[in-house]
């Protein structure tokens, strides 16, 4: 049976961790599906990981659709989530709905992910009202890397931390059914996870999120040129073993440890957030 957003809400209620992995092809999707990974994210990170681009901004809708089709063919139980690429939803309501629907109709994805907060809440509402599950993404949002000044931890001071909380509330109110928090301080992610009714998925955001996500190539140590602080290599000899180790460590709370997290907020500052 295909996993669903309802089942992920139930996991949050039961305090059971959700596992997500970014992958881009049929073979890796089969491994993840057989390893009982909850969600396979066809991330726009494929622009850098697979296509050798410098950032995620150049990948197109047509390219994302091709890779999503491949993953959908390999995933029988895992929920397939597709990243909407840069400017495929920001430009207009019409583009947002039409492009989201293409992922469902043409690539057989089960939902879509978008980056941003209050500024795209109206797009989230339109897509979700059309019957498509929407996952939001806050913190370090790679599509806004030029505005953020690079790939840096977000929410390190009172103003920026409060902005992320306000955005999180806004996307939930707009109809998002899950939220990815990338590279925010552990205590901020913990506070957001406690405030929201929808599940949070962390990457570089600590162990208190309702689930975790890593890129398939990163958790297996396949990219020797990249090793972010939040990445842990599990096993590059046997992908199935590596994925299952990742799954088990997420579910048991072993991963991520403090070693793979960022913490810039003290308790005094945290108490001022609402």
Swiss-Prot record:
The encoding gene: panB
NCBIfam families in alphabetical order: panB, PRK00311.1
Domain of life of the native organism: Bacteria
Pathway of action: Cofactor biosynthesis; (R)-pantothenate biosynthesis; (R)-pantoate from 3-methyl-2-oxobutanoate: step 1/2
GO cellular component: cytoplasm
Residues annotated as binding Mg(2+): 44, 83, 115
Name assigned to this protein: 3-methyl-2-oxobutanoate hydroxymethyltransferase
GO BP of this protein: pantothenate biosynthetic process
Cofactor binding note of this UniProt entry: Binds 1 Mg(2+) ion per subunit.
Names of the cofactor(s): Mg(2+)
Intracellular or extracellular location(s): Cytoplasm
E.C. numbers: 2.1.2.11
Job of this protein: Catalyzes the reversible reaction in which hydroxymethyl group from 5,10-methylenetetrahydrofolate is transferred onto alpha-ketoisovalerate to form ketopantoate.
UniProt xrefs under CDD domains: KPHMT-like
Catalytic machinery residues: 182 (proton acceptor)
SUPFAM superfamilies reported in the protein's UniProt record: Phosphoenolpyruvate/pyruvate domain (SSF51621)
Keywords, ordered alphabetically: Cytoplasm, Magnesium, Metal-binding, Pantothenate biosynthesis, Transferase
Family: Belongs to the PanB family.
Reactions listed under catalytic activity: 3-methyl-2-oxobutanoate + (6R)-5,10-methylene-5,6,7,8-tetrahydrofolate + H2O = 2-dehydropantoate + (6S)-5,6,7,8-tetrahydrofolate
Chief location of this protein within or outside the cell: cytoplasm
Subunit composition and interactions: Homodecamer; pentamer of dimers.
Pfam families linked: Pantoate_transf
